Amino acid sequence: MRKEFCEKDNILITYTENDVCFEDCKTADAVLLANDGTVIHSNFNNEKTEYYKDYFKRIYSTITSFRSFDSL
């Protein structure tokens, strides 16, 4: 089941045990990243995709903590 991490600057960030998704709330464009940071799907341009891959690296430890709390 997909869980909501947060919404910031009209970007909704959600996660499952296997992936993290960044979705633009205005356009519904999104990038879906596997836990290792590889792109599963993206309809953002390359620049935005790379931006969210970098952002993913910065927040991944927090998402991992959320996953741990979810399992309690």
Functional labels for PLM-detected ranges:
Residues 39-72:
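Mixed-charge, Lys/Arg-enriched low-complexity segments
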Residues 1-10:
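Negatively charged, low-complexity tracts enriched in Asp/Glu with abundant Ser/Thr
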Residues 10-11, 20, 57-61:
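Short linear sequence elements within intrinsically disordered, low-complexity coil regions
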Residues 11-12, 67:
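Broad hydrophobic/π-residue packing in well-ordered secondary structure
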Residues 13-47:
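A short, structured beta-strand/loop element
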